[in-house]
Amino acid sequence: MESLFRCPVCGAPLDRGDRAYRCPAGHSYDIAREGYAYLLPPNQKHSAAPGDDRDMAAARREFLSKGYYDLLLNTLCCQILSLSGESPVIWDVGCGEGFYTSGIFRTLVAAGKSPRMAGTDISKPILRSAAKREKGIAWAVASSFHLPAADGAADILLDCFSPLALEEFRRVLRPGGHFLYVVPGPDHLWELKQVLYDRPYPNEEKETPYEGFAYRSIVPVEDTITLPCQADIHALFQMTPYYWKTPKAGAERLAALESLTTRISFRIHIFQKL
């Protein structure tokens, strides 16, 4: 059965068998027991273990499973539902541990649609966690800058907090298809930042036009969450870039908290390929 994936070596279609993906040229990629394939050639890795590690994967899964970001998930589901035909092809690029990918897939199926979805991430531990969530999605370890996808293959591309690979997104998205780019809003985790830093500053908010895409809308998502225990606070901290660049004193202040109430703020930028 022909899959959504293309061979990362020669670009030919990959057929999915019971245990491996294979292309007509004979290149073969085993399917791990969790259900994902490794489609990241050595020349695209740039490090021995690219992307987030196993601890980061566990922190994300634990935090997101408690519903703290469900408002963002539900808003994404509504937007993608309104943009989708009966059998949409959707790629979640830099999908992380698959929280949004799986939620969107299940929403579309529940609405009577027949989505074909792929989730890719450069981190093997993160992708392994994602593949356990939903067997109906095609999962692969792959670079966002070298997607194992055919030209014009996707109706919708989703990028949540991952690096932009605009040239590749233009290649993979069909004309008229939609690209959803999720970024933190100005006040995202403001109260967390007040604990970590002496002089926190809001995230920049701007509309950036991208060549080959028309801006369609920006959807704001705003909420306040309360983390009732240090374990959840630490899990959230691990999910953020602040985990790697916070002064020791700020990290110690956060570790001393027994609870934290903080704003969450997101922007969903919606583009359409020209």
What are these regions (language model features)?
Residues 1-49:
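N-terminal auxiliary segments of SAM/dcSAM-dependent transferases
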Residues 2-3, 193-213, 221-274:
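Conserved Class I S-adenosyl-L-methionine
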Residues 46, 51-75, 79:
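Class I SAM-dependent methyltransferase Rossmann-like catalytic core
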Residues 89-91, 97-146:
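Class I SAM-dependent methyltransferase SAM/SAH-binding core
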Residues 145-156:
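A short acidic, Gly/Pro-enriched loop at the edge of an enzyme's catalytic core
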Residues 173-174:
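Helix-to-beta-strand junctions that scaffold the AdoMet/dcAdoMet cofactor pocket
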Residues 177-184:
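Conserved beta-strand signature within the Rossmann-like core of class I S-adenosyl-L-methionine
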